[in-house]
C-alpha cells in the first residue's frame, strides 16, 4: 500500500486551469453561504454539500439516506454523496471565470516575473491588465508587406481628397469674403465694421486650414503607427486604436486585460527567446547584459521544467475546502466567518455579473470595467493589499487573504507547522527539591494522574480492579485509593520531559524520572537550574510525556539529566554546585588557626594533640565537641589516595587501597574528599567555586558520566548540609561602613575643588575638566573599596559569600557598604559628580535621581537584547539546520593549524584559548616533536591528557581537522567535527551539529551588551562596535561601521598626512603596481601591530606590511578579506572576530560551533562563465554541485564553468537554501514561493525544518535512515522483570515464602471469582 506520508521529495509548480478543474468536485456558482433559517448550506454556494460533502457523517442533505450502510451512495434527490463529514476538509471546488485574470504574485512580485518573461515594463503591464491600454498581440507581417503599396496609394488618395476639399472650401470662403467686402464698400460702411468682417472671414479660413491639417496629421499618425505596428506594442489612445481597427483590422490583433496577456504567452516562443538572450549575454555589455541575465533566469525556468507559463493567467479559481474557512454561529444569531469567504463572495458576485453583461451584449466599456473589477477581486483573494488599497471588512480592517494565511509568525508555517501544541503535557510552578537525585524530579500527584491516565486505566483493568475501560476511567476521575498504588507502579521507570521557556539551547528540555509529591508544584533538582536558567521566584515549567517505547528509550538514554552534565557549547560541566552549595563546601574546607582541638606538636610538659588514627576517630571527637570541623589536625588515612607529589615520594610503585599515609589537613577536607570517587587524589585546599569547577571538570574527563552524576549529587547534599550549619546569613549588622571613609572623601573633595578652580580660571576646557574629575573620583572609589576590604573581618558572612564565589562580587559589596561611585548618563558618559553614599547609609535625592539614568537604561537594554538575541538565534538555526553528521570520515587531508603555545625566551607559554580552539578536535597529521618522534598520531582526539603530552614535548602548533575543510557533500563528517562537546566522545552519525552550533552561539547572546562603547578621551575616537550588534554584523557579512582598509599586497608603505586625511601607498615587494589608499580619515587612527623586529607600535612611514594586514583601527570588511586572501582566510577571520566579542564577555564557546555557521556562509559560488555546463552566468550554486558538474563536463571533454566563492550573510544564505519549504517558513514567504513555483523547485527533504513541516521524522539523531529499521520488542525476560514479586530473602520470614525466582506472576490466569 502507498503510504501518504512516505515520499522522498516535494515539488511545487504552477497549476493550470485543467489542474484546478481536476482537483475540483464541482463549480461554486452562487455567493450564498448558509441559509440563516435552516442553518443548512445553500446549494451551489460556498458551503454546498453537493460539492464539498455532507455536514454530518453518513447523512445526505435531504435526509433520504442516513447511517453508514449507505456508504458511497450519491443521493438522487439532492446529489450529496453519503460519506464522512471530514471530507469537507479536503474536497475543493472551483469558480469558472467569465474572463481570464492574471495571478498577482507573478505580475506584482519584485521582480515582475510576467514582465521579465514578456519583456514588458511593470508599468505597461499594469496598464494592460487593468484596462488602461491596448496591446498588440499579433501582426500579419507578410500580408501587410505585400499590400503596403496598395494601402499607401489608398492613403495618398484619401489625403488628396482631404486637401482638395480643403482647397475648395477655402476658395469658396475667399469668394464670399470678397463679395461681402464689395457690398460693404458700396454701402459706405465705417472702416472698423469692414475690418471686423475681414477678420471674421480670415479666422474662419484659418479654422478650415487647421481642421484639415489635424485630419492629415491624424492620417499620418495612423499610417506610421500601422507601418511600425509590432506585437507587444502598447496603444494608450483609444480613438487611435479604434481607427486602426476599422481601417486595418485584418492585419493585426490587439486586446486589453488578461486576455491579451494570455494571447501573448500562447504565441511566445520560449526556446527562441532563450537562445537570443544567451547570445546577448555572450556578446553584450553593461545594462543590456544584466537585463538579459535576469530575463534568462525566468525564461530558462520555463524552458527546462514541465511548467507552462500559461499557469500565470487563470481561467478558473480554486475554492479551498469549507472546513478550512469555517462559518460559526455566535450567540445572538449572528455569524462569524473567515475573511476568505468574503473575498470569495466578491469574486463570485463580480463573475456572475460579468457573465450576465456578456449575455446581454452590453457595451464594451461596461464589460471591460466589470472585467477589471473581477481582476481586482481575484488579486485581493490571492494577496490583499499587494496592489492599491486593501479590501477592508467591518471596522476598516484589511481582510486576510490566502497569502496572509501563510506569512509571518501567525501564519500557517510558523504557527501550525513548525510549532504545534501537544497532548500529554501540563505545566506548573517549580519549587526546589533538594532531596532528589540528579535524574529525578518531583511530579504533583494530581498532575501525574492526569498525564498517565490511559496507562493507569489499562493497568487497573489488567489487575481486575475494574471490569472495563469505562469503569476504570470513572475510578481515576473519582480518585479511588487503588488508583494511587497503580499510579506508583505505572510511573516507575517511565521518564518525563521537563521544559522551561525560553528554550535557548538543547538543555532547556531534559528527561527525569518522576517521583510523586504532594502539593501542586513540580520539584526540580537544584543542580539542573543552571542548564534551564531557572530560579524559584515563580518560574513555571512544562511537563511532556514520551509515549512509545522508542521515545522512552531516547528520553532515558539521550535526554536524562544525569547524561547531560556537560555544556554542548564548551564541553565543560554545567551541573555544578552553586550559591548555597558553594558556601557550604567553602565553609567545610576552610582552615581556621587556633580552632578547637587543633594539632599542637609535642612539648616538654605535654604530648602532641590533635592526631587521629582514622577519620572515624576524628568524627567521634567532633561529635563529642572536642574538635572543630575547621581545625588543622593530623590524621592517618588508608581509604583516600594521597596527592600526586606525596604518592611519588612515599609510594614509588604506586599507592594501593589500604596503604596508610598521614595527612596534615582539617576534618572538613577529609569529609569533602570522601565524597569524591574512590582513587581520586586527595585535594587539600579550600574549596572556592573555581576549585570545585576544576575538580568536576577533571572528573568529567576521567570518569564515566554516572560517577560524575553521583559525585555532584553527593557534593550537593554536603553543600546544603554544611551551608545550613555554617550559619551564613545576611543582616544589616553585617554591612559595615569603613570608619575612614569620610576622611578619604574629604581628601579627594579638595582635589576636585582645585580642578574646578582651574576650569573657572580658564586653564582647562570642559572635556579636560570632566576627564580629570572622573579620574579623581574613580581613584576615590577604589580607595574606599580598599579601606572597606581591610576593615571587614574574615568571617563576615557577606565576605564569605563573595570570596567563596557563591554569588556577587566585591563591587556590589562596595556599593552596599562603601560608596556607589560614578554613574553614567543615557549617552554612556560618566557624570562627573559621584554618588558618595552607600546603600547602607542611603542616597540623597540628587544621588538617587542621577542613579536612575543608568538603572533604567539597563532595564531597557535587557528587554531589547532579549528580542535581538532571540532573532539572531532564529537566523542561525535557519542557516545551519541541515548540517548533520552524515558519515564517519570524509578522508580529507586538509585541516587548519591551531596554536597550542607560544615560545617566550626558552619556555612555552600555554595559549589561553586552547580550551576553545584545539581541545576536542581530531589531529589531521601526526604531531611530531623536535627529534621526529610521533607524540600523538593522526586521527587521535585531543583531550586534556593529549594536549598536556603535546605541550610536554614542546610542540607549539598542530594541524587539526575542521568543518571548514570537510569534504562531505551535504552535512559534515564526524572526524572533521571532532568530539561532541556534550558527551566527550567522537560525535555520532546523525547528530544535528548545525542546530547545536546555532544554540551555543545564540544562547549566551542575551549576556552580550547592546551598547556600542565610546572610547573615553579627548581624541574623539570612533565608536567601537561591540556586543550583539558586532556579532550580527559579522554573521550578516555586512560592511562594518568603522571599516578599516587592508593591505592588498605585501610591501613597504609610504605614509602622507594632511590635516584631515592619511594617504597610504604600498610599494609591492614583487615590483608590481603601487596600491594607493586615499582619503583615510584621521579620526580612525593608525593600527598598532607587531613588527618584524617583535616590537609593538603604530604603523609608520617605511614599515613593511603583509598582505591582508589592517592599516587603520577598526574592523576589516570580510568581503575585502575574501577578495584579497581567499575563502580560508575569511573563515578564520570571521571565527576570530566573533570569538573576540564573546571572550570579552567571559563566555566560553568552542570555535567549531562558529565554524559550522561560517561554513554555511561560504557554501555558494557565483558562476562567472558557464562553460559547457547547465549553469546560468551570474547565478549562485552550491559548491558541491558546482564541483560535481565540472567533473562531469571535464570527463566528457567539455569546458568547465568558472566561479568565484561568495560570502553571504546568514539571512541571505537561509533564503538561498535548496529547500524551498525551509526558506518559505523563514522570511519573505510569498517571494520564495513565487520563485519556487516558477522554477518548479523540488525539495529533497534533507534538512530538519522541511521534515518537521510535513510531519516526518527529522533526519537527525535516531530519525536518520540507518536507525529507522530498528524495532523495539519486549523479550520474555524483560516482561518478567517488569512485574516481579519483591524478594524477601534477607527478611525474617524468608522460609515461608520460598525462593523468589524473579519470574512474572501470571495474573491473567488466576480466577478471581471466589474472592468476589
Swiss-Prot record:
What does the entry list under GO cellular component? DNA-directed RNA polymerase complex
What is this enzyme's catalytic activity, as reactions?
RNA(n) + a ribonucleoside 5'-triphosphate = RNA(n+1) + diphosphate
**Which residue ranges run through the membrane?**
none
Q: Which GO BP terms, alphabetically? A: DNA-templated transcription
Any keyword Transferase?
Answer: yes
Q: Which InterPro entries match?
A: DNA-dir_RpoC_beta_prime, DNA-dir_RpoC_beta_prime_bact, RNA_pol_asu, RNA_pol_N, RNA_pol_Rpb1_1, RNA_pol_Rpb1_3, RNA_pol_Rpb1_3_sf, RNA_pol_Rpb1_4
Could you tell me which SUPFAM superfamilies the record lists for this protein? beta and beta-prime subunits of DNA dependent RNA-polymerase
Q: Which cofactor does it need?
A: Mg(2+); Zn(2+)
Region: Disordered; residue ranges are 183-209
What Pfam families does its record include? RNA_pol_Rpb1_1 (PF04997), RNA_pol_Rpb1_2 (PF00623), RNA_pol_Rpb1_3 (PF04983), RNA_pol_Rpb1_4 (PF05000), RNA_pol_Rpb1_5 (PF04998)
Q: SMART domains annotated for this entry?
A: RPOLA_N (SM00663)
Q: How is the cofactor bound?
A: Binds 1 Mg(2+) ion per subunit. Binds 2 Zn(2+) ions per subunit.
MF terms (GO), sorted A to Z? DNA binding; DNA-directed RNA polymerase activity; magnesium ion binding; zinc ion binding
Which residues does the annotation say bind Zn(2+) 2?
890, 966, 973, 976
Its biological function?
DNA-dependent RNA polymerase catalyzes the transcription of DNA into RNA using the four ribonucleoside triphosphates as substrates.
| Record-stated family | Belongs to the RNA polymerase beta' chain family.
What's the name of the protein?
A: DNA-directed RNA polymerase subunit beta'
> Whose protein is this, by species?
Mycolicibacterium gilvum (strain PYR-GCK) (Mycobacterium gilvum (strain PYR-GCK))
Amino acid at each position: 500500500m502507498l503510504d501518504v506520508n512516505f515520499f522522498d521529495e516535494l515539488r511545487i509548480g504552477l497549476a493550470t486551469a485543467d489542474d484546478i478543474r481536476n482537483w475540483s468536485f464541482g463549480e461554486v456558482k452562487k455567493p450564498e453561504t448558509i441559509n440563516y433559517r435552516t442553518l443548512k448550506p445553500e446549494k451551489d454556494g460556498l458551503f454546498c454539500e453537493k460539492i464539498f460533502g455532507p455536514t454530518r457523517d453518513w447523512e445526505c442533505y435531504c435526509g433520504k439516506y442516513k447511517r453508514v450502510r449507505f456508504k458511497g451512495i450519491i443521493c438522487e434527490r439532492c446529489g450529496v454523496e453519503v460519506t464522512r463529514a471530514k471530507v469537507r476538509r479536503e474536497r475543493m471546488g472551483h469558480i469558472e471565470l467569465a474572463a481570464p485574470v492574471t495571478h498577482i504574485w507573478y505580475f506584482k512580485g519584485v521582480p515582475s516575473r510576467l514582465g521579465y518573461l514578456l519583456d514588458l515594463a511593470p508599468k505597461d503591464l499594469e496598464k494592460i491588465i487593468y484596462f488602461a491600454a491596448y496591446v498588440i498581440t499579433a501582426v500579419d507581417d507578410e500580408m501587410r508587406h505585400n499590400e503596403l503599396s496598395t494601402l499607401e496609394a489608398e492613403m495618398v488618395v484619401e489625403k488628396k481628397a482631404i486637401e482638395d476639399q480643403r482647397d475648395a472650401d477655402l476658395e469658396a470662403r475667399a469668394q464670399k469674403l470678397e463679395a461681402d467686402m464689395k457690398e460693404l464698400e458700396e454701402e459706405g460702411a465705417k472702416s472698423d465694421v469692414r475690418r471686423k468682417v475681414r477678420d471674421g472671414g480670415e479666422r474662419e479660413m484659418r479654422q478650415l486650414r487647421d481642421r484639415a491639417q489635424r485630419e492629415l496629421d491624424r492620417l499620418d499618425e495612423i499610417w506610421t503607427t500601422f507601418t511600425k505596428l509590432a506585437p507587444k506594442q502598447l496603444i494608450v489612445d483609444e480613438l487611435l486604436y479604434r481607427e486602426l481597427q476599422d481601417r486595418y483590422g485584418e492585419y493585426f490583433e490587439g486586446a486589453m486585460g488578461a486576455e491579451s496577456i494570455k494571447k501573448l504567452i500562447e504565441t511566445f516562443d520560449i526556446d527562441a527567446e532563450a537562445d537570443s538572450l544567451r547570445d546577448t549575454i555572450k556578446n553584450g555589455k553593461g545594462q543590456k547584459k544584466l537585463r538579459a541575465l535576469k530575463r534568462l533566469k525566468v525564461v530558462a525556468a520555463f524552458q527546462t521544467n514541465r511548467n507552462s507559463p500559461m499557469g500565470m493567467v487563470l481561467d478558473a479559481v480554486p475554492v479551498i475546502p469549507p472546513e478550512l474557512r469555517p462559518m460559526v454561529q455566535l450567540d445572538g444569531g449572528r455569524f462569524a466567518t473567515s475573511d476568505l469567504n468574503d473575498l470569495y463572495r466578491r469574486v463570485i458576485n463580480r463573475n456572475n455579473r460579468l457573465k450576465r453583461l456578456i449575455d446581454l451584449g452590453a457595451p464594451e466599456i461596461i464589460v471591460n470595467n466589470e472585467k477589471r473589477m473581477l481582476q481586482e477581486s481575484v488579486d485581493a483573494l490571492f494577496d490583499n493589499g499587494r496592489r492599491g488599497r486593501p479590501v477592508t471588512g467591518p471596522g476598516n480592517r484589511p481582510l486576510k487573504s490566502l497569502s496572509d494565511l501563510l506569512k509571518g509568525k501567525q501564519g500557517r508555517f510558523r504557527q501550525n507547522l513548525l510549532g504545534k501544541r501537544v497532548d500529554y503535557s501540563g505545566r506548573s510552578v517549580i519549587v526546589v527539591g533538594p532531596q532528589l537525585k540528579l535524574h529525578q524530579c518531583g511530579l504533583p500527584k494530581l498532575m501525574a494522574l492526569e498525564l498517565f491516565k490511559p496507562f493507569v486505566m489499562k493497568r487497573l483493568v489488567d489487575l481486575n480492579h475494574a471490569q472495563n475501560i469505562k469503569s476504570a476511567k470513572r475510578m481515576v476521575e473519582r480518585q479511588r485509593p487503588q488508583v494511587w498504588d497503580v499510579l506508583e507502579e505505572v510511573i516507575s521507570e517511565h521518564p518525563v520531559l521537563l521544559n522551561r521557556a525560553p528554550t535557548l539551547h538543547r538543555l532547556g528540555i531534559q528527561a527525569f524520572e518522576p517521583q510523586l509529591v504532594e502539593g501542586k508544584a513540580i520539584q526540580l533538582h537544584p543542580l539542573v537550574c543552571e542548564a534551564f536558567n531557572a530560579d524559584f521566584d515563580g518560574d513555571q515549567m512544562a511537563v511532556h510525556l514520551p509515549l512509545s517505547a522508542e521515545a522512552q528509550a531516547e528520553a532515558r538514554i539521550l535526554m536524562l539529566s544525569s547524561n547531560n552534565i556537560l555544556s554542548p557549547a564548551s564541553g565543560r560541566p554545567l551541573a555544578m554546585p552553586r550559591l548555597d552549595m558553594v558556601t557550604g563546601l567553602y565553609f567545610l574546607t576552610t582552615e581556621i588557626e587556633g580552632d578547637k582541638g587543633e594539632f599542637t606538636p609535642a612539648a616538654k610538659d605535654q604530648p602532641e594533640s590533635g592526631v587521629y588514627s582514622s577519620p572515624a576517630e576524628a568524627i567521634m571527637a567532633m561529635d563529642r565537641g572536642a574538635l572543630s570541623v575547621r581545625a588543622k589536625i593530623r590524621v592517618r588515612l588508608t581509604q583516600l589516595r594521597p596527592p600526586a607529589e606525596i604518592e611519588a615520594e612515599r609510594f614509588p610503585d604506586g599507592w594501593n587501597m589500604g596503604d596508610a599515609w598521614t595527612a596534615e589537613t582539617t576534618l572538613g577536607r577529609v569529609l569533602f574528599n570522601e565524597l569524591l570517587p574512590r582513587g581520586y587524589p586527595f585535594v587539600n585546599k579550600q574549596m572556592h567555586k573555581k576549585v570545585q569547577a576544576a575538580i568536576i571538570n577533571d572528573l568529567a574527563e576521567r570518569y564515566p558520566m554516572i560517577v560524575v552524576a553521583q559525585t555532584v549529587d553527593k557534593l550537593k547534599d554536603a553543600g546544603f548540609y554544611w551551608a545550613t550549619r555554617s550559619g551564613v546569613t545576611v543582616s544589616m549588622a553585617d554591612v559595615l561602613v569603613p570608619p575612614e571613609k569620610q576622611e578619604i572623601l574629604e581628601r579627594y573633595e579638595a582635589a576636585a575643588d582645585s580642578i574646578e578652580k582651574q576650569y573657572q580660571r580658564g586653564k582647562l576646557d570642559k572635556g579636560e575638566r570632566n576627564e580629570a574629575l572622573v579620574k579623581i573620583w574613580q581613584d576615590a572609589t577604589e580607595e574606599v573599596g580598599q579601606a572597606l576590604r581591610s576593615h571587614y573581618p574574615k568571617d563576615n558572612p557577606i565576605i564569605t559569600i563573595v570570596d567563596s564565589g557563591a554569588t556577587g562580587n566585591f563591587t556590589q559589596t562596595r556599593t552596599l557598604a562603601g560608596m556607589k561611585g560614578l554613574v553614567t548618563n543615557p549617552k554612556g558618559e560618566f557624570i562627573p559628580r559621584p554618588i558618595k553614599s552607600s546603600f547602607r547609609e542611603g542616597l540623597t535625592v540628587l544621588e538617587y535621581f542621577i542613579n536612575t539614568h543608568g538603572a533604567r537604561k539597563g532595564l531597557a537594554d535587557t528587554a531589547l537584547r532579549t528580542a535581538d538575541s532571540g532573532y539572531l538565534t532564529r537566523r542561525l538555526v535557519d542557516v545551519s539546520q541541515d548540517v548533520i553528521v552524515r558519515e564517519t570520515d570524509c578522508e580529507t587531508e586538509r585541516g587548519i593549524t591551531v596554536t597550542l603555545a607560544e615560545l617566550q625566551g626558552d619556555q612555552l607559554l600555554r595559549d589561553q584559548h586552547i580550551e576553545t580552539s584545539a581541545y576536542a578536535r581530531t589531529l589531521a597529521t601526526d604531531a611530531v616533536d623536535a627529534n621526529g618522534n610521533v607524540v600523538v598520531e593522526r586521527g587521535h582526539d585531543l583531550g586534556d591528557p593529549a594536549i598536556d603530552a603535546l605541550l610536554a614535548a614542546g610542540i607549539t602548533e598542530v594541524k587539526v581537522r575542521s568543518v571548514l575543510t570537510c569534504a562531505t557533500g551535504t552535512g559534515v563528517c564526524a572526524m572533521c567535527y571532532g568530539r561532541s562537546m556534550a558527551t566527550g566522545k567522537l560525535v555520532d552519525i546523525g547528530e544535528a551539529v548545525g542546530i547545536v552550533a546555532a544554540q551555543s552561539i545564540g544562547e549566551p547572546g542575551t549576556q552580550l551588551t547592546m551598547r556600542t562603547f565610546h572610547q573615553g578621551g579627548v581624541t574623539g575616537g570612533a565608536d567601537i562596535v561591540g556586543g550583539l550588534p558586532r556579532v550580527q554584523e559579522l554573521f550578516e557579512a555586512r560592511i562594518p561601521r568603522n571599516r578599516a582598509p587592508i593591505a592588498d599586497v605585501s610591501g613597504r608603505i609610504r605614509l602622507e598626512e594632511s590635516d584631515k586625511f592619511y594617504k597610504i601607498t604600498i610599494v609591492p615587494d614583487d615590483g608590481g603596481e603601487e596600491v594607493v589608499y586615499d582619503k583615510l580619515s584621521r579620526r580612525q587612527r593608525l593600527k598598532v601591530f607587531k613588527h618584524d623586529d617583535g616590537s609593538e607600535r603604530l604603523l609608520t612611514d617605511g614599515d613593511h606590511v603583509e598582505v591582508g594586514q589592517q592599516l587603520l583601527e577598526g574592523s576589516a570588511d570580510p568581503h575585502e578579506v575574501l577578495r584579497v586572501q581567499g575563502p580560508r582566510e575569511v573563515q578564520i577571520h570571521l571565527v576570530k572576530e566573533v570569538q573576540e566579542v564573546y571572550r570579552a564577555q567571559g563566555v566560553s564557546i568552542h570555535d567549531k560551533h562558529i565554524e559550522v555557521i561560517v561554513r554555511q556562509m561560504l557554501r555558494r559560488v557565483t558562476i562567472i562563465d558557464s562553460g559547457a555546463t547547465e549553469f546560468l552566468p551570474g547565478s549562485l550554486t552550491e559548491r558541491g554541485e558546482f564541483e560535481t558538474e565540472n567533473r562531469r563536463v571535464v570527463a566528457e571533454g567539455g569546458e568547465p564553468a568558472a566561479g568565484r566563492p561568495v560570502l553571504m550573510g546568514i539571512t541571505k544564505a537561509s533564503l538561498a537554501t535548496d529547500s524551498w519549504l525551509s526558506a518559505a517558513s523563514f522570511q519573505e514567504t510569498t517571494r520564495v514561493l513565487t520563485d519556487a513555483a516558477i522554477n518548479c523547485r523540488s525539495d529533497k527533504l534533507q534538512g530538519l525544518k522541511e521534515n518537521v513541516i510535513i510531519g516526518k521524522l527529522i533526519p537527525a539523531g535516531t530519525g536518520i535512515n540507518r536507525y529507522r529499521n530498528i524495532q523495539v520488542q519486549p523479550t520474555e525476560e524483560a516482561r518478567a522483570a517488569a512485574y516481579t514479586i519483591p524478594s524477601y530473602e534477607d527478611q525474617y520470614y524468608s522460609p515461608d515464602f520460598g525462593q523468589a525466582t524473579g519470574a512474572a506472576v501470571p495474573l491473567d490466569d488466576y480466577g478471581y471469582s471466589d474472592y468476589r
